[in-house]
Amino acid sequence: MGVDTMGNMFFTRPGEDSDADPVYMGSHLDTQPTGGKFDGVLGVLGGLEVMRTLNDMNIRTKRPIVVVNWTNEEGTRFAPAMLASGVFAGVLDQNWAYERTDAKGKTFGEELVRIGWKGDEPVGSRKIHAMFELHIEQGPILEAEHKDIGVVTHGQGLWWLQVTLTGKEAHTGSTPMRMRKNASLGLGKLLQLVNEIAMAHQPDAVGGVGHIDVSPNSRNVLPGQIVFTVDFRSPNQATLDGMKARFEKEAPKIAEELGIGIEIEVAGHFDPVTFDTGCVEAIRNAAERLGYSHRNIVSGAGHDACWVNRVAPTAMVMCPCVDGLSHNEDEDISKEWASAGTDVLLHAVLETAEIVS
């Protein structure tokens, strides 16, 4: 097994042609604070199951096959998301990534060393013929339409904006309404603005706020500061940028009307993704040959495959999840869905890695 300087882990099954670029498959093992047990994990375990099946069946391939576990995909502790795959793809600077800090001021680089997973292999030095990522949909479409497989053609781009509102701490009971500099009121109005912006770009755009930090967070104190993160996503570049631009234009006006301060900073960004046609067709062909119901789908979430797609042909296989629920401890899938997704992954990889008879 190889480990690079960002902690990405690679397990290789040799091919008959040692000079041929490998076919990769995998995902991530990190999770959300209250995340489920299939987000990311399915893709890594599915890759290992493919590897085990090839060994059990004594199937040889021309190209080596690699299972990869990408580090810090979620970006929960160390923002942004897909940090290590972003460095691998040359999108993010490695030293910048090492300097990302958590809520306690500890850096990603320091913690990578502490847990013993800062490898010696230079990040991004590996050649990739193609990569496939198996993942749960994290949405309700496949289950609602009774589809076994989602053939992912595109990935949504996103803008994460960190917004800091500065009001004035004051007693909630004795401060007259007209004399307040109320950051929490600003939060409420900006939450509504985020929703309005997303609803103006239906059916594909989404917008929301998932993180809110209120200070001092006391029941009878008007907050002096509120920090929250806006998440805008769309598969269309113009729409995505337009959503960000409208928020940046209108949010300061709302803050000014309330007499509170506002700062808006970019916390994360990537452009919409179009996955490789050949890899997408390999997935679709596998689903059709195996008799699984399927449909094209756009990934609403960001994935490591979105970054890797910049340096190698890439595509994704998706399977349904119960009620579309993800980033939740109740996240669940059926054995049949997991089996179908892994089966399609196996055959797409074999088509690409070329079976040696």
Spell out what each predicted region is:
Residues E73, R77-A238:
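Midchain, well-structured core segments that form catalytic/ion-binding scaffolds
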Residues M1-G36, L54:
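Acidic/His- and Gly-rich active-site-bordering loop/insert found
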Residues G210-N217, T229-N236, G261-V280, G300, ...:
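A short beta-alpha structural unit
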Residues N95-W96, R233-N236, A267-H269, G324-A338:
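Short beta-alpha connecting loops at secondary-structure transitions
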Residues M25-H28, T34-E74, W159-L165, H171-I197, ...:
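Alpha-helical metal-binding/catalytic segments enriched in His/Glu/Asp
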Residues G7-M9, L29-Q32, I65-T76, Q138, ...:
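Acidic, glycine-rich active-site loops and adjacent beta-strand->loop/helix elements
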Residues G2, G26-S27, H294-V344, V349-T352:
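Zn-dependent metallopeptidase/amidohydrolase metal-coordination segment
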Residues D4, R60-P64, G119-G124, S174, ...:
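Flexible, glycine/charged-enriched surface loops at secondary-structure junctions
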